[in-house]
Each structure stands twice: as structure tokens, then as C-alpha cells.
Amino acid sequence: MRGSASRTDAGGAAARRAAGRRPVTILLLAVMAAVIATAAAAWSGRATAAPGGGKIVAVGAESQYANVIGQVGGKYVQASAIMSNPNTDPHTFEASIAVAREVGSAQLVVQNGIGYDAFMNTIESAAPSSGRTVINVQRLLKLSDATPNPHLWYDPGTMPRVADSIAAALSVIQPSHKAYFEANAAAFNDSLGKLTAAIASFKAAYSGVPVATTEPVADYLLTSLGADNLTPWTFQADIMNGVDPSPQNVAVQRALLSEHKVKVLLYNQQVTDTLTESFITLAEQNHIPVVGVYETMPEPGYDYQTWMQAEVRDLRAAVADKIATEHL
């Protein structure tokens, strides 16, 4: 298996998209509520501390958001990620007591929304805290709950707005450092210039290039690059949600590869199953380069900017030189 996790419960995972994650048991939820309440009480003083106090405790539900928190907050923030292991399937992540404690202690939380990290809502609602600010990226972008693709960080327009929102939230918690946070957010946004240039260069050279995917992990990025994703959306969504795709869609996907209708196959490097492995093998047999893309930021050695730049670089290498890159 190329992915470090495997999705083999195709039929049983059909409800995962709606629920966001596996349901938390009543007992665990009760314990979480107690843990969060204790943590919230312990940290309430810190959350309302005088400007210029100790480090702000912040949590990103996904490592990419935690990384941006750290870049914007700098020396005044202690940022951590709930989902930071690229060997974990984000779609089957289950919150633990330790996670509940971590979220309960946070003064700032950044989460994705659209059901991708619904366990965060469960934890936060178990014990609300007036000292906790939550940035829900879905709400920030004014996206509906019916938005089909939750991988918002792959849209180049997402993180600049997230960085600015983080700076604003941190400035409320520690107003004396507002200029520092705003300068860091501006520096982060400026640093995305290399990614913007790489996207523009790819689009100028390869706009309309046909590609296939197993899941919609990088679909927002593919759109910005001008690539033409020929894989049926319903196929991508079924694989993402752990549902068996229709025989018709499977046949379409096979034809894209066996008939050389696409220049590259992108797959979710973190999660594969027997079906997706068969498509990877078919692509390789037909000398179509395969590129692995990630749902959570690879660590160590990457920040959000260099991660996205690497994804664009690898896709360009596949299209231009038929170079496969399955691991960053």
C-alpha cells in the first residue's frame, strides 16, 4: 500500500461525509465535557489576561492551519495541531481525551469546517468558553454546508484570508502586539508570491492539460492551474467518502488511463484502498506518471507555502517530463 492508511470499509463509511467523523460515544463525550470544563476554568484567567501577558495558546485542527497560526503569532503564540501525522487518514480521525484537553485549553482555534473536522464542534459545544475564539474557515469564506469539496487549503485564495483573520483574533487577545501580528500576516501573504508565480507559469504553459484523480484532494489547486480534471466528480466523491463508485464511473476512470486520455494521475498519498491501488498500477503500466498529494501538511521540513509549491512543482514535472512523485 502506498498510502500509510487504508480505506477498506467502503460501504460502512457512507455516512462519514455527513457526520464528519465517526460518532463520539456518549461516555467519551461526557468525559470530554468534564475535561474541557476543567481546562477552560484553568485557562480562563489566561484567556482574559492583561495585554502583553504570556504566550497565547492556539490550536489548528489540521497541521496546515496550525502552521499558519505559528507564522502569524510568532513568539507570542504557542501553536499546536490536532491532526499532524501524515500517516493518518483524516477522514477516520477520532477525538481523544487528550485532544479534548488540548482544545479546551486553547484561546484560539482554527478549524476547516464542511464536516471535515466535525469532531471539533463536538468538543467545543461540550463545554463552551467565552475565552475561546474559533475561526471556522468555511464560515470565514461564507461557504454553505453543502460545499462538496472540503479541502479548502488547496485553494490559493484561502490562506491569505485565514492569516488575516488569525492576526485580527490574536490582536484582540493581546492588543499590545497588534502591529506585530499584522506585520507577520502581511509577510506570510507576501511569501505566497512564489506559489502565485508557479501557478501562473504552469497555467501559461499547460492550461487545459487533462488529468485524472482518485479523490478531490487537490481539485481547487488544479482549477487554479487551469488543468482539466476528467475524472467524474461522483467517482472522486465516492472514493473520498468510502463509498463504492458505480461500475460506469470505474469504467470511465479505467479508460482515461488505458487509452492515454490524461497526462498524470493524482492520488491521495495518505489513504489508498484496493481500487485506488489498481488505478495507480494501471497508470504505471501505461507510462502515465503518478503524483501523490497530501491532505495534511508533510512534516518536518515544510511550511504551508513550501508544501503547496512542492505540489505544483511535482505536477509540472509529471506533465512536462513524465516524472512520477509519490512522496514529498
Predicted regions and their residues:
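Extracytoplasmic metal-acquisition and chelation regions
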Residues: 2-3, 7-28, 38-328
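Extreme N-terminal signal-anchor transmembrane helix of membrane signaling/transducer proteins, especially
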Residues: 33-37
